[in-house]
Amino acid sequence: MLELDLQVASETSAPDEARLRLWCEMGLRQRSADSELTIRLVDETEGRELNNTWRHKNYATNVLSFPADVPDDMLDIPLLGDLVICVPVVNREAVEQGKSVDAHWAHMVIHGCLHLLGYDHIDDEEAEEMEALERTLLEELGYPDPYADDESADPPHSDTPSKDHE
């Protein structure tokens, strides 16, 4: 079961909680344990501040993933982590990339959830594994391959803030 804490700190239109939950559940379905995660929807000011604080990059990115860094035996709850999604950035990227807003949101949420599960795209092999899983999950939801238009494209800008990830 997924315990989702949705925090809306953006005035920009975003998908509703039911769709966010569906996409999270799809991204986390390989995890058999219960999961608790927070999604915080932000505008560009907060997105830029968080990206600058945690990644030392002074721009708002689409998704930031913050995995819980607490030993399992220290918690009474199955805390997975937090996703911070910059609503205007995701909406703008969808238009710029010629994708449906819904499909791009699904991709970004699934991408962020996979980061919380430990997937990454630091090297090519990891990126290929993560992208293949994203393609499969999105296809099951009826969305097109997010990488189809440009096979040489970099993965989404979503990152997991950590000193090891730069």
From Swiss-Prot:
EC number: 3.1.-.-
Cofactor binding note of this UniProt entry: Binds 1 zinc ion.
The family this protein is said to belong to: Belongs to the endoribonuclease YbeY family.
Keyword presence, Zinc: yes
Localisation per UniProt entry: Cytoplasm
Species of origin: Pseudomonas syringae pv. syringae (strain B728a)
Protein task: Single strand-specific metallo-endoribonuclease involved in late-stage 70S ribosome quality control and in maturation of the 3' terminus of the 16S rRNA.
Name of the protein in question: Endoribonuclease YbeY
Record GO biological process: rRNA processing
InterPro entries given in the database record: MetalPrtase_cat_dom_sf_prd, YbeY, YbeY_CS
Pfam families: YbeY
Binding site for Zn(2+): H111, H115, H121
HAMAP family for the chain: Endoribonucl_YbeY (MF_00009)
